[in-house]
UniProtKB/Swiss-Prot annotation:
Protein's recorded name: Leptin
MF-aspect GO terms: DNA binding; hormone activity; leptin receptor binding; peptide hormone receptor binding
This protein's GO CC annotations: cytoplasm; cytosol; extracellular region; extracellular space
Positions of disulphide bridges: 117-167
Keyword Transcription listed: no
Subcellular location: Secreted
Taxonomic classification: Eukaryota, Metazoa, Chordata, Craniata, Vertebrata
Length: 167
């Protein structure tokens, strides 16, 4: 009689441990799909093809460049900066991309949680001091450079997800 609860518990535990492994792979797949979707959206904006992600533009040094090895924390911080820059732009082209970045950051937080990592909250990031001045002086260049660098960063993140990044 006392074996019955133990057997139920073991059966339930085996079920729960199996169920838990599947969603993490789904989250990782969803993350990769969303990255590919964002890259496609950037490609659909025709004027982003005219600038290299490596090109230096005065005043835009706060926009992250390419990072070959990224942790989940660094990915989140980088995407937070891009999200902040894109939401500061008045262009209608980038609104959906900024929303997609928020969703992508949420997926990265789920991946980090599955690895028992805690990502620092970056929602209250201060806007870079030079952003307003740069937006007034060269709105078009800021959008082009930000989207070009974001595309490169997303490609790096996509590659890192294949090798299971650290916290």
């Amino acid at each position: 009689m006392c074996w019955r609860p133990l057997c139920r518990f073991l059966w339930l535990w085996s079920y729960l441990s199996y169920v838990q492994a599947v969603p993490i792979q789904k989250v990782q797949d969803d993350t990769k799909t969303l990255i590919k979707t964002i890259v496609t959206r950037i490609n659909d904006i025709s004027h982003t093809q005219s600038v290299s992600a490596k090109q230096r533009v005065t005043g835009l040094d706060f926009i992250p460049g390419l990072h070959p090895i990224l942790s989940l924390s660094k990915m989140d911080q980088t995407l937070a900066v891009y999200q902040q820059v894109l939401t500061s732009l008045p262009s209608q082209n980038v609104l959906q991309i900024a929303n997609d970045l928020e969703n992508l950051r949420d997926l990265l937080h789920l991946l980090a949680f599955s690895k028992s990592c805690s990502l620092p909250q970056t929602s209250g990031l201060q806007k870079p001091e030079s952003l307003d001045g740069v937006l007034e002086a060269s709105l078009y260049s800021t959008e082009v450079v930000a989207l070009s660098r974001l595309q490169g960063s997303l490609q790096d993140i996509l590659q890192q997800l294949d090798v299971s990044p650290e916290c």
